[in-house]
Amino acid sequence: MKSSYNLRSIAAKVVGQVLDQGQSLSALLPVHQREVSEKDRALLQELCFGVLRVLPQLEWCIQQLMAKPLTGKQRTLHYLIMVGIYQLHYTRIPPHAALAETVEGAVALKRPQLKGLINGVLRQFQRQQEELIQREANHSSHYLHPSWLLARIEHAYPNHWQTIVEANNQRPPMWLRVNRLHHTREAYLNLLAQEGIEAFPHTEFTDAIRLASPCAVDQLPGFSQGWATVQDASAQGCVYWLDPQDGEQILDLCAAPGGKTTHILEAAPQSHVLAVDIDETRLGRVKENLLRLQMHAEVKQGDGRYPDSWCEGRMFDRILLDAPCSATGVIRRHPDIKWLRRDRDIEELVALQKEIFDAIWPHLKVGGTMVYATCSILPQENAQQVTDFLTRHADATLVDTGTRELPGIQMLPHADGGDGFFYAKLVKN
């Protein structure tokens, strides 16, 4: 950590790295949080996530306040103005402090000559704030999504696309997965209540608990001992539908960061799990999760398209394929997805999913079960992908999961519910 720093300038740089360089916020933020004191880390996260969540609104406001946007080497100052407007409109930071710290950010970014400009734009926003926000509410920027994604969501869900978009724009709830090897869900709910933490059980997924308000993990009873894991309810549905059993050979493909790997081992502690991911760095997270929960799984780096290079001819009783996808179901947790994804990416992802799906199917034993899952809400990656797979593989049968949405189950993001997710359960004849 630097002895002195300007937090607003750091937030502006992070936003710029996401928007101009295409970097992932979840990868960037921990690196930059090390530049600030522990007490400032939550604020840095709030500013970065917040600006990316409401980006079109901030862009629209700046267009009304400035004749010409800052570009080129001054582009980071454009993002600094966004950080300032976000603070003034969305946070409880006293306006004088938000203004002063944001204006000083220009010095930290080595553009002291622009302090007056930034001060003027932010003060103008202060004066016109109510009028600007009212006008913006009637503009397409109010949906806070890129037009291509908005069009895809509206086409897929013509009757309730606005509800999905609204859920994407909200702050996500915090869900826990209770480790059934330590406590029943009811017992852990009692432990939370003793700590004054209000929580609610999920109606379908038997290990899932929603906190009334998010809290730091060190406040959770027994977190360091592995009593609970932070994992969205819909993500927990993958293992719920996989239904692993003791003694089975189980493959968790595209396993990082390991939430589903450890969930499999909680559900079937005597199973033999192979966790595979293409990203060596993210496999480190799988190992960390296994260590915290004191569990063992075989962890390998490998490309799902070429299983012969890593699975050594092994056959599996169950396979969980959490396929690479557009992540359009988890936008509320990762608002940068809206700006990192492009329309053309969807077809490329569908082709990649097909390749992995087809490549791994021969490694499922006859009578074995596969769950195909994504954290997408787009039909091309989900129901259509499974329909096409079934036409190519006569030895695949879809398991009826009791929904009318065959093939598979499509979960949509909901304010008090889980993220957007899709599951299809298949059995090999």
UniProtKB/Swiss-Prot annotation:
Gene Ontology cellular component terms for the protein in this record: cytosol
Gene Ontology molecular function terms on file: RNA binding; rRNA (cytosine-C5-)-methyltransferase activity
First-listed, main subcellular location of the protein, grouped into a coarse class: cytoplasm
PROSITE patterns for this protein: NOL1_NOP2_SUN, SAM_MT_RSMB_NOP
UniProt KW keywords: Cytoplasm, Methyltransferase, RNA-binding, rRNA processing, S-adenosyl-L-methionine, Transferase
Subcellular compartments: Cytoplasm
InterPro entries for the chain: MeTrfase_RsmB-F_NOP2_cat, MeTrfase_RsmB-F_NOP2_dom, NusB-like_sf, NusB_RsmB_TIM44, RCMT, rRNA_ssu_MeTfrase_B, rRNA_ssu_MeTfrase_B_ent, RsmB-like_ferredoxin
Residues binding S-adenosyl-L-methionine, per UniProt: 254-260, 277, 303, 322
Reactions it catalyzes: cytidine(967) in 16S rRNA + S-adenosyl-L-methionine = 5-methylcytidine(967) in 16S rRNA + S-adenosyl-L-homocysteine + H(+)
Family annotation (Gene3D superfamilies): Helix hairpin bin, NusB-like, Sun protein, domain 3, Vaccinia Virus protein VP39
One BP term from GO: regulation of DNA-templated transcription
Domain of life of the source: Bacteria
Pfam family of the protein (one): RsmF-B_ferredox
SUPFAM superfamilies given in the database record: NusB-like, S-adenosyl-L-methionine-dependent methyltransferases
EC identifiers of the protein: 2.1.1.176
Active site (catalytic residues): 375 (nucleophile)
Family statement drawn from the similarity comment of this UniProt entry: Belongs to the class I-like SAM-binding methyltransferase superfamily. RsmB/NOP family.
Record function comment: Specifically methylates the cytosine at position 967 (m5C967) of 16S rRNA.
Stated name of the protein: Ribosomal RNA small subunit methyltransferase B
Organism of derivation: Pectobacterium carotovorum subsp. carotovorum (strain PC1)
